[in-house]
């Protein structure tokens, strides 16, 4: 608050700072203060790019500012759910931090008070969720934790494998769910032809 354009998130034992410009001396001093207050292992900064291409995505990987570096991949927890993240994967770390409220809504099966995500009749049995453009399946894991059988679609096999690891981190069997590699819009047409239906589409 009071620092427009500068975002700081705690990611496990690390702080992740994000802005569209390099850190100023005052910002670095504030990060040092926060690191001491929260017993942080290391602090990273990521330069935000509005429309990053492949080269820019790699260059925009979070850079260590001070402290100990993170391992290539490590697990963090949010609302009791574990996710694998990485500061070495380019522009994104494997979890969209600004979607935490939506992940919480999936976990609770409620969009808001009096607005259930699925009909009450389905709460105590499996319901079907489709996660198009699934990335590393963060939403899929939350839906599965909430009792859904989840179909996840992504154009990247690597990210779908990452998603399966997220399922395993949460003691969820990936074999009980479906992971579809390919173009999401093409898969939607195929699923429609197969008369597949879902209670929730993400």
Where are these regions (language model features)?
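Short, well-ordered secondary-structure micro-motifs
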Residues: 55-56, 142, 189-192
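Non-catalytic substrate-recognition/targeting regions of SAM-dependent transferases
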Residues: 2-9, 25-97
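Receiver (REC) domain switch-region micro-motif
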Residues: 43, 129, 201
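Conserved SAM-binding motif I beta-strand of class I
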Residues: 149-154
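S-adenosyl-L-methionine
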Residues: 158-200
